[in-house]
Amino acid sequence: MNRHHGLLPRTGLTLAMAAALALGAPDARAQFIPYFGKNKVKYDDFAWRVYKSPHFEVYYYPEFEQHLARVVSYAESAYQKVSSDLKHEISFHIPLILYKTHSEFEQTNLFPTFVSEGILAFAEPVRDRMVLPIDEPPDKLQGLITHELTHIFEFDLVPRNIMQRNVPLWVDEGLADYERGIWDTLDLMTIRDAAVTDQIPRLSRLEEVLDFANPRVVYNLGHAAFEFMEARYGKEGIRQFLYTLRKNIVGGGIDDIYMQAFRIKPDEFDEAFEKWLKERFKPFRDKQRPSDYGKDLSPDAEKTAYTQVYAFSPSPSGEIVAAITGNRGDGEADIILLSAKDRGIIRNLTKGFTDDYENLAMSDQFVAGRSIAFDPRGDAVAFFARKGKRRSLFLVSVLTGKTLRKIPMDLDQAQSPCLLPDGRHALFSALKEGVADIYLLDLEAGTYKNLTADAFADADPQISPDGTVVVYTRRVSGHDKIYTFPLADPSRKTQLTFGPYDDSTPTFSPDGMKVYYASDEEDEIYNLRSLDLASGVIQQYTDALGGDMAPAPLTGRGGERLAFISYFKGEYRLQSIETSEPVKEVEQEVQLAADAIVDFQPDVVHQVVSENKRKKGMFEGLFLEGRPPLNVGVTSGGDFFGGTQVALTDVLGDQNFLFTAVSVRELRSYDGTYINLAKRFHYGLSAFDTTRFFFVSPLALQQSFFREGAFATQRYTGASLIGQYPLDKFRRLELNAGVIRVDEAFENPEVEALVRQRAEQLGVPYFLHKGTVVPMGVSLVSETTRFREFGPLSGHTYSLGAQYSPSFGGTLSRTTLDGDVRKYFRIGGSAVFATRLHGFRSTGDQPDVFYFGGNMELRGYPYFSFAGNQGFYANAEFRFPLIDLMKTPLGILGPVRGTLYGGIGGAHFKGEQWNFSTSDPGRSYVNDPVFGEPVEGFHLVDGRASFGIGLQFFFLGYPLHFDWSKLTDLKVTSNNTRFDFWVGFDF
């Protein structure tokens, strides 16, 4: 379930795969995904305990103990509701894995990639596990648990491991939201907007359902669809639909679901649902659209890369607005400065990709909360951003975009900054021990003080113009209400708004006499209101169709206006309105103070039974982790390769056993790896038998060898201890030590004899070895690269490694240095200038053998046709988009991209006479590999280079490459053009 209504970010390899690749032997799997991956850092050590309740097997840790009874009560209450509604019982204890905070939840090993801050929780179908943090307010936590538990019931009703087709997303997520039993105001807003503005897709057409910029709309359409089923067919109709879905999904088709469940055709179901939904929201058709308000301050999406506005803060002068907006080019959020006069873009304060932080932090309330703030002098914009485990407060200059100040927080979910008029302090909200409070931060010292210190969820603090009074929201009995207190005495809390509805994002008027805020009292729609602090009069300024949120006064030459975020036709826009003519006055009945109100209570109250507690076993619950994946590819030499991996993990994903099989040509490679991911330092043991091939014509014999005649193999059999220590998300140390049996040989014995004879004639050692090596290695790996669906877009990647193999008892002796450095320069939207330098050097009595060539390494040359103990290759490629997607008889192909590339490199063996280049007269063998042709001036001798053009497109998820290359020695270019086809990812 998503907290913020946005897409998940693109991430690198999972750490489990990255760790499994850290072997002491060459790993054939690297040709499938040639990236190093980022790190999921375990900042905390969890001493896991297990508690068994009537329906759950709860995994928690000692710091969670005080919350156990409460959360189990929520879970058992949810089970009672969902089981009753669906008339279904789960036959096993459901694994419920709990974290105290979201930052701890993000460290789970059960999510396949990185857990973004926008993911509230998840349920997975392989082991039917629920995984969630508990730092939501009580009523929202109850709803969250109900949502995820419904997924477990869905997985049990419609088993995912035997399905021929996927369950539609609107069914899975819609039923989960339906079972919560309530509508979130923002969710109801999106479905009302879709109904009134004629944007309801046909649910039976999956491609239409997924065609929304706001992914939450799919959840909400599903929620509404199940309410429609209940209204038309009753709860029994919902159950009939689910059991029919089970039968059809398992059987391989879904076209007959509606006929079998409801006796209507799919199109008739779509029409009936659309009619019902439009009729439901028909009374709202005459409400205000954004065009009724006046001025639109949003960036022009047709003229800029910026789309919607999710948070904003006006400057003190009212002439500029800082806004968090979506950047289509980067695929990320940015903070921009907008002109309040003509909505022109003044500056992007967070332009481009940065390693200073991982992501901007939005309010937990998304658009219904505050996420950024101008300082009172108008010189800087403040916001929270994620770096490491927690967030830091950043102050960025509006003139230069440079960071003026960065203050790390040791609290969770720090958000909603507000800079005080004294210039030395700031207000913000944050979580400690799972409870949200308002804090006062000293900007100079970096220290903070808890101002509210109560059991309620407090958020969105704002300061009065004179700097003496704080206004904020507190969640009471399932609703957000507005409170104030004097900054000098925070204990004197005063409740300003009352009633069973939400009042959010309060802020003072410029004269401090009013508080502006958004309220969903009327029709569960956020509208703008003000409360006169002297008279208590409440005025309402909008009557929105969608919703108007997060008001802030906008002062300027034209007088005072009220800026706010409005939702219409699926987009969040920044609007403004005059406050001189309110829509109406609102009466309010003052009620009891919040401290006298009993907060949320679950339906089932569970008493913890101490005898049901125990410690979790280290390897408890080992289980096959999903279906084994299948990877395939084709080298530029026409060699097919493929592989698969079987993974066994414990219930927490901390203990992993990986069994891998890879095939290249007729060669087979196998390895089994154990990796422990429970703590920050990951360690394990790998046993392997890997065989790879290369082509080599050394010692001036290249004219005598053809490709197959030069075929050699390298077989490594042994075991390695492996370890990784993440320094942060982007950098890590990798360690390995092992014992490996090396067997290197030419496939053709006659060729091997010829090479040995030639080595003796030259008085140099033979370069292929048989024996045992005991390597000990360390590498520094870094990857800041940002990826898109086609591959790298921006950033850098490097791996710098050293390995030493001592000689004792007849083992092979070698010392090896290996460095792979890549840099990606983004050009425009998705064009990339990619560079790479990979160098290696192995010394000692029996140095290691490296090989490269073909595919993405040195295009135009045979695959793995360069080999040696030392050498390098360098690449420079301009990759650019041609077609985003294209529909063909074979299916959807794309994106289609072009490549202009050039590469240079070479390798040689110990003792071999080798000259990379020269300026002396010589012979070029580019067009005549036997006799050559005379050349003068600078040219390559033993070095090699190529350039050309390529075409890449994706089919069934696999990148297909078509390359046309010219070979060159930098003096002579080949007359013929070499064509290569290969399947695999670019570096």
Where are these predicted regions, by residue range?
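Conserved blade-ending motifs and adjacent loop-strand segments that build the rim/top face
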Residues: 500-503, 537-552
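Outer-membrane beta-barrel initiation region
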Residues: 572-573, 578-676, 680, 684, ...
